[in-house]
Amino acid sequence: MRQFTAVVNPTAGGATSAAALLGVARLLREAGAGLETEYSHSLAHARELARRAGERDRIVLAVGGDGMAGGIGGALSGTGAVLGLVPAGRGNDFARALGLPTDPAGIARVLLDGEPRAVDTIEVTSAVHDRTVVLGSVYAGVDALANHHANSARLLRGTASYYAGALRAVAGWRATGYRVTVDGTEHAFTGYTVVAANSGYYGFNRLIAPAAEVDDGLLEVVMIHDAPRRLFFTLMNELGTGAHVHRPQVRVLRGREVRIEADRAIPYGADGEVDAAVPVTARVLPGALRVLSEPGAAS
């Protein structure tokens, strides 16, 4: 029977994470699986706990949102250890990209009977990140600023916090000159953001890169050019379906390595964590992580 180690950060949405784990834990134990729980005091500590558990050949459960999934998944990338996801955050974008359930019974089913699926990860290099590995996307611009505001929100949750953060970010945003180098070819433009996406979803289930696949060895590079604010909000609404990619203000490229530079120190984010400014380089690591997925979904 499978042996699990759940890593929970009690200081980051801890009540929600603990509640999500409770129902799943009961079902795992009733099925005869072994489960131990580790509580982290920071994302760096969570990564270390995950590495130790993986070294003991335990399946490591990331309990929380995309920041926790990205941190723990990044720590396990390239190690051969297996990751299980217990979605309990505001976005859960990477779990959504994998088609994972969010109800306790569905989560437990995948953890007990699912198959490890090899997925790509992203290596991030900047003045702050020294080859840090994340799962979903790296984005630089107004969306990173919106994400920062959403993370700081105290009264709002989920999509409401993201939209409030976006309104605040866009209101004070000025067009930025970007230099985006994709596999050695430079592309210059003025605009709102650049997203290097492994997962199609980001920003609380917004479909930023509809063609992105987590196991194709490529990053989708979405560049949103300068546009009137009214049109930008239309683009934001179209992120729900991915229809924005058909707009002339949106350009999509593909590549294995993406470097993002700008004419000012704009923020960038990675899997919901915003703590640095460009320049930043994102490089895909093909098939570097094994994640438990629905039976039959393994590649």
Placement of each model-derived feature along the sequence:
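Short Gly/Thr/Asp-enriched flexible loops that form oxyanion-binding sites at enzyme active sites
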Residues: M68-T79
